[in-house]
A protein has these predicted regions:
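Structural recognition of the beta-strand scaffold that forms the well-ordered cores
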Residues: 37-40, 87-88, 136, 157, ...
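Glycine-rich tight-turn/loop motif centered on a GG-T
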Residues: 57-61, 109-114
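Residues that cap or flank secondary-structure elements
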Residues: 17-18, 115-116, 206
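Helix C-cap/helix->beta junction micro-motif
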Residues: 80-82, 131, 181
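A conditional alpha-helix N-cap/helix-loop micro-motif detector
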Residues: 19-20, 117-118, 167-168
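An N-terminally biased module of ancient metal coordination in phosphate/nucleic-acid-related enzymes
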Residues: 1-88, 93-95, 195
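Charged catalytic cores and adjacent phosphate/nucleic-acid-binding surfaces used
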Residues: 1-8, 12, 23-28, 95-111, ...
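C-terminal active-site-proximal or functional interface alpha/beta core segments in diverse enzymes
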Residues: 98, 114-116, 120-123
Length: 229
């Protein structure tokens, strides 16, 4: 039985200032790499709202920031034109901390309705879950990250292709020590630039065509991550 590949961590130049590859090039790259689905997870960071930097390094209001993020997802869908399923997501950073969290399952209007990147983690997590979403701590062992209480998140990104290999090993060891083996474990390329090779994600027996299907797959753990470590 064929397995279908989904990327869970991908940035595009049209939605993340730290990414340099165009949406068009990114979509073609993932199609060529044999992926069926792609979650666009551009950054949403609280410190970028209303700063003195020029756009898009600074965005005047939260609502405009949400539109900027989701417009990039819509652009990716248009570019893919049915050749690749493009799904909603974002990578958020909340105040007073350099941790990053991958959020799946919330549409544009849901994110606009509550300033999620100004909230404390427990409040943000509660909102995400109450609205059917999933929150995963991204690259937890990267330098500058802080490990958080497991009850505030649904899962951990246990493989990130931008990490040093020992960082991916360490998170698995830490999860075992704290008894958090019931959490969702994910993998992602953390794609940003032209030289980033799509190399990670999840494998499923059926293609993931919608964000709702993605949430169902994640919550049911009906997938395998790749690469295996």
């Amino acid at each position: 039985m064929p397995l279908y590949k989904t990327e869970l961590h991908c940035h595009t130049r049209d939605g993340s200032c730290c990414a340099s590859e165009s949406t068009e090039a990114t979509i073609e790259k993932y199609i060529a790499a044999g992926y069926t689905s792609l979650v666009i997870t551009n950054h949403m960071q609280s410190y970028r709202i209303g700063s003195t930097e020029p756009f898009p390094f600074s965005i005047p209001t939260y609502e405009e920031y949400v539109d900027y993020c989701y417009d990039a997802i819509d652009l990716a869908r248009r570019v893919a034109d049915g050749r690749l399923y493009v799904l909603d997501g974002f990578e958020m950073r909340i105040p007073y901390c350099t941790n990053d969290y991958l959020v799946y399952g919330l549409d544009r209007e849901c994110v606009k309705a509550f300033n999620i990147i100004k909230a404390e983690l427990d409040t943000a997590s509660k909102y995400i879950r109450e609205n059917g979403g999933v929150i995963v701590q991204a690259h937890p062992m990267r330098f500058g990250m802080t490990l958080v209480r497991p009850e505030y998140i649904d899962g951990y990104e246990v493989h990130n292709s931008h990490n040093k290999p020992f960082m991916n090993t360490m998170i698995r060891e830490w999860i075992g020590h704290i008894g958090a083996d019931d959490k969702i474990f994910t993998a992602g390329t953390d794609h940003h630039n032209h030289d980033d090779i799509p190399s990670a994600g999840i494998l499923t027996e059926a293609p993931i065509k919608t964000t709702e299907e993605l949430i169902s797959v994640l919550k049911s753990r009906s997938f395998k991550i790749f690469p295996e470590e």
